[in-house]
């Protein structure tokens, strides 16, 4: 979580002047910090985060536990980067996926604490979704891998 907060502080430093010049769209400012469903539909946001993270957990287990990649961790790391890219491109439209609880929660805390110009609320009513859905989704993905291939 400290990495997510530190990274978000760098984003704030880079975009501060743009936040000052975005008076009519606090939602656009929040989108630089955290995820949220495009239609403000919590069920859709939960399902999207859950499925995307289940896929990530399943594939990560395959990359790091599969016979081919055990000897070549660097290839597995590249594979994870490509999987995350594909998940963001394919399933990221509805929510701008978190895929990780810290990716949403840390920056949302930064948004809530800092006196950012023209910001609105931090949408805490949605904040539980990227935490719970990603955790449960990853557990399901790992469980499906273990059932399918064992460890």
Q: Residue ranges of each PLM-predicted region?
A:
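Membrane-interface helix-loop junctions and terminal tails of multi-pass membrane proteins
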Residues: 1-151
């Amino acid at each position: 979580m400290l990495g997510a907060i530190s990274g978000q502080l760098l984003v704030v430093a880079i975009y501060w002047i743009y936040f000052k010049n975005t008076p009519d769209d606090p939602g656009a400012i929040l989108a630089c910090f955290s995820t949220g469903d495009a239609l403000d539909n919590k069920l859709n946001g939960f399902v999207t985060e859950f499925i995307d993270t289940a896929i990530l957990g399943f594939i990560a287990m395959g990359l790091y536990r599969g016979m081919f990649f055990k000897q070549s961790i660097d290839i597995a790391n590249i594979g994870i980067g490509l999987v995350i890219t594909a998940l963001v491109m394919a399933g990221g439209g509805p929510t701008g996926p978190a895929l990780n609880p810290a990716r949403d929660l840390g920056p949302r805390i930064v948004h809530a604490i800092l006196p950012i110009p023209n910001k609105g609320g931090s949408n805490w009513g949605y904040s539980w979704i990227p935490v719970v859905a990603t955790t449960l989704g990853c557990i399901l993905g790992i469980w499906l891998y273990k059932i399918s291939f064992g460890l």
